[in-house]
Each structure stands twice: as structure tokens, then as C-alpha cells.
Design a protein with these regions (language model features):
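Residue-level hotspots within pore-lining transmembrane alpha-helices
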Residues: 24, 28, 32, 62, ...
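N-terminal transmembrane alpha-helices
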Residues: 6-44, 60-72, 76, 101-108, ...
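Helix-terminus/linker motif at the lipid-water interface of multi-pass membrane proteins
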Residues: 31-50, 119-126, 182-189, 246-279, ...
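Small-residue-rich hydrophobic transmembrane alpha-helices
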Residues: 49-109, 146-165, 269-333, 369-391
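Short alpha-helical transmembrane segments in multi-pass integral membrane proteins
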Residues: 1-19, 77-142, 188-239, 295-364, ...
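Short runs within selected transmembrane alpha-helices of multi-pass transporters and secretion channels
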Residues: 70, 139-157, 165-173, 194-207, ...
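Transmembrane helical elements of multi-pass membrane transporters/channels
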Residues: 17-36, 138, 149, 172, ...
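Transmembrane alpha-helix boundary and packing residues in multipass membrane permease domains
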Residues: 22, 26, 38, 75, ...
Length: 448
């Protein structure tokens, strides 16, 4: 199986080539998310779309917590691989497996019983509450599948392998679309069918990744790691990354609650825009994953010169990419939104107008989001999860402040720029923090 040593070679070429499969994988992931939404909205109507939309941030929180934990748990693997220490890599992989299982069980035990109350707190409209709760229950039960895939994909990325997760995501996407058609349109399972299709697709992707991880025979542990330090180190990185995503999602839920006050059609427009949000940040997320691996391996090898050069180049690449995507979405935004909102549905014109207003506000400020991902992931790869968590806290504060204050003065239009304010709050923390760390790499290395 292919592994990639990112401590040697041209920095920008390594990062870009590593991120390309991730980008394609994210495109396929967004494809099956989009297909979910299109099938649900076209076959079940605007209210079904709104039911998914009002639970978007709640379901994202569970998935993002699991993803954050998996990514944090895998950072020590990248460090160990950068130093070419096989024994250390084996212990890190063994520790990740145990931590992944335990953390998912604890997460479900805490959150699952609270889901109905959270949806009530979000002011979910009564006419879509049952469907929203059913969909959320399925997604949360499926977090075991989500962790299964993300833990294995994170291990592969730590070894510099971004192609296998791409192949896994292609398989998952194709299966998800087929299962959507079968469960939602064929068997008439309704909104639950869309959730079940997603969970099964994650399981298949995880099995594919597991097959390829097992090919790393010299790195596969033969026993469970019993050194408590390894468990502490992974949780030291994984928990702050998970909490960072919790803070972001809480802010998103506050925003959703504010959106819910303005009715189902405003919510449907917001939901359609949110589905395109994933498309907006595909490249940003991919560059981010690449930087976690790149900075992680070079940090383990003490190649601080390569870290400085790589971050500088990926920031410029991110800005150029974001400007190009902004132009495309500004021009073709109405067409993309029309994929989610059927013109024959009740309230379709209103929903389209609201969705377009949200989308255009985000596209203007998209470079800020790309800077956020570039700097946050670089800092995480440097074995510092605290600063990204603090940036998540500032995102939360900005989202809550914007969602509560701006509508007082501007009505529903005040909700359009709230997401942008959250990005600004995070960047204010991340950018100066990274350059402070860059000036003190040797001290940071000794501390971490």
C-alpha cells in the first residue's frame, strides 16, 4: 500500500498532490449529501427538506465530534511515521483503536437521550418535529459507522495515503445514491431511509479502508498498548479538536434556532444554502487535511524550515482557490439552489430568494474561510489542539452574538452574515497564534 514521506521534496507539489484525492473524495461525499437532499426534497417535499435542515447542525455536531476525535488520535501516528519509528507507530495505532471505541460509546450514552430536548430548544416547527427527530436518531446510531470509517481513513492519511480514502468515498457515494433511491423512493421509508442509506455507505467505506490498513503489516500492532501515556497523548489532541467542533455546532444550532423563528420557507432556503456550504469548503477542508499530515510529519522530523515554507504556500493556494470558487458560485448560484428546491413546491420562490441571499453573502467572504482551514490545520499538525479549540470558542461567541443581535436591527436579513462573523472570530485567533508558534518552533517542540 502506498505511503508518502512528506519530509522530502517540493512542499507545494506534495501538499497539492496529497490534497487532490481528498478534494475528489470530498466532492463525492458532497455528491451523496446533495443526492440525499435532492431525493428527499423532490420526492418528499419542502417540509421534509426543512426537517433535515433544522437538524443539520445537531447531526453535524455528532459527526464532527467523531471526526475531530479520529483526526486528533491520528496526529501522533504522523509524528511517529515522520521519525520512522515503527514500534511507536504500532503503539499509536493500537491506542487509536481503543480510544475510538470508548469515545463513541461515551458520546452516544451522553447525547442520544437528549436529542428530543435539543430539537425542542432549537424551536423546531411542530409540523416537522417527528421527521426531524427520526432522521437525527438514525444518524446518531450510525456514529459507530462514522467513527469506523474516519479512524481508518485518518490512519491512512497519517501515512501520507490520500488515495485510498478517495476510493472508499467513491464506493460510499455510489452505494449511498443507490440506497437512497431504494429506501426513499422504492420502499417508501421516507426521511429515515435517507439516514439509513448514509450509515450503510459509511460502513462500506470503513471496510474498504480496513482492508488497506491491514496491508501495512509491519505497522500493524500485535497487542493492545498498555502505556497510559499514549492514551493521554491522543486524548490531549482528540478531545480539544472534538470540543472545537462542539463549540462550532452549538453556534450553528443557535443560528438554526434563530432561522426557525422565521418559518418553514426561510428554513428551507437556509437548508438549501447549507447543502452548498459543503461545496464551498471542499478545497479548504482538503488543504486542511493535507496540512495536518504535512506539518505533523515534518514536526516529528524537526523540519521547521519546511513547515514555514509549506504554510506560506498553502495560504496563497487557498486564497487563489477561494476566489475562483466565489466567482463560480456567484454566477451559477441560482442554478445550484434550484437542484434542492422544486419550483412546483409550495413556497419555492420564497425559499429560493432566501437561499440565494445566504449564499451570496458567504461567497463574497469565502477567502476568510479558506484562511481559517489552512491555519487551523497547520496548528493542529504541530500537536497543538488548544488554540484551535479557543478559535472554536470565538466562533461560538460570534455566531451567538450575530444570531441574537443582528435580527433586532435588520430582521431576518440580519442572519445572512452571521456565518461570516464566525469565520472572522476564528481567524483573529488562529493567524497571530500560528506566527507566534512559528517564531518559537524549538520552544514549542520542547514543550509538546
Amino acid at each position: 500500500m502506498q505511503v508518502k514521506d512528506m519530509t522530502k521534496g517540493n512542499e507545494l507539489k506534495l501538499i497539492f498532490l496529497f490534497s487532490l484525492p481528498l478534494m475528489l473524495g470530498n466532492i463525492f461525499q458532497q455528491l451523496y449529501t446533495v443526492c440525499d437532499t435532492i431525493i428527499v426534497s423532490r420526492h418528499l417535499g419542502v417540509k421534509a427538506l426543512a426537517a433535515i435542515g433544522c437538524s443539520d447542525w445537531l447531526t453535524w455536531m455528532g459527526i464532527a465530534v467523531v471526526t475531530g476525535l479520529a483526526q486528533g488520535f491520528s496526529i501522533p501516528i504522523a509524528h511517529a511515521f515522520g521519525t520512522h519509528d515503527k514500534s511507536n507507530v504500532q503503539k499509536c495505532i493500537s491506542t487509536l483503536a481503543v480510544n475510538a471505541i470508548v469515545s463513541t460509546v461515551v458520546l452516544l450514552a451522553v447525547i442520544y437521550p437528549l436529542l428530543p430536548n435539543i430539537l425542542i430548544l432549537l424551536k423546531t416547527p411542530a409540523d416537522i418535529m417527528d421527521r426531524a427527530l427520526a432522521y437525527t436518531h438514525v444518524i446518531y446510531i450510525g456514529l459507530f459507522a462514522t467513527m469506523f470509517y474516519n479512524a481508518l481513513a485518518s490512519i491512512l492519511r497519517a501515512f501520507g495515503n490520500s488515495k485510498t480514502p478517495l476510493q472508499a468515498m467513491i464506493i460510499a457515494s455510489i452505494c449511498n445514491v443507490g440506497l437512497d433511491v431504494l429506501f426513499v423512493m422504492g420502499l417508501e421509508w421516507g426521511i429515515i431511509g435517507a439516514g439509513v442509506a448514509t450509515v450503510i455507505a459509511q460502513i462500506l467505506a470503513g471496510c474498504f479502508c480496513l482492508y488497506h490498513v491491514l496491508k501495512l503489516k509491519e505497522y500493524i500492532p500485535t497487542s493492545i498498548c498498555k502505556d497510559v501515556i499514549y492514551y493521554k497523548n491522543q486524548f490531549r489532541l482528540g478531545i480539544p479538536m472534538a470540543l472545537q467542533n462542539v463549540l462550532i455546532s452549538i453556534g450553528g444550532m443557535v443560528l438554526t434556532s434563530a432561522v426557525n423563528r422565521y418559518g418553514t420557507y426561510f428554513l428551507a432556503g437556509f437548508t438549501a444554502m447549507n447543502k452548498l456550504y459543503g461545496v464551498l469548503e471542499i478545497s479548504a477542508v482538503s488543504y486542511g487535511y493535507a496540512m495536518v499530515t504535512y506539518t505533523g510529519q515534518n514536526y516529528g522530523a524537526h523540519r521547521y524550515d519546511r513547515i514555514k515554507s509549506g504554510v506560506k504556500k498553502v495560504v496563497l493556494l487557498s486564497l487563489a482557490t477561494s476566489i475562483l470558487i466565489s466567482i463560480i458560485l456567484w454566477i451559477f448560484g441560482p442554478f445550484f439552489l434550484s437542484c434542492f428546491i422544486s419550483k412546483t413546491s409550495e413556497g419555492a420562490n420564497e425559499a429560493m430568494t432566501y437561499g440565494l441571499n445566504f449564499l451570496r453573502c458567504l461567497t463574497v467572504f469565502l477567502p476568510i474561510l479558506y484562511m481559517l482551514h489552512a491555519y487551523r490545520s497547520s496548528i493542529q499538525g504541530l500537536s497543538n489542539a488548544f488554540i484551535p479549540m479557543v478559535s472554536g470558542l470565538f466562533e461560538l461567541l460570534m455566531r451567538i452574538s450575530g444570531a441574537l443581535i443582528l435580527p433586532i436591527y435588520f430582521g431576518k436579513a440580519g442572519l445572512y452574515p452571521v456565518e461570516v462573523l464566525a469565520w472572522i472570530g476564528a481567524v483573529i485567533i488562529l493567524v497571530p497564534s500560528y506566527y507566534y508558534m512559528e517564531r518559537n518552533f524549538q520552544k514549542v517542540s520542547e514543550k509538546c
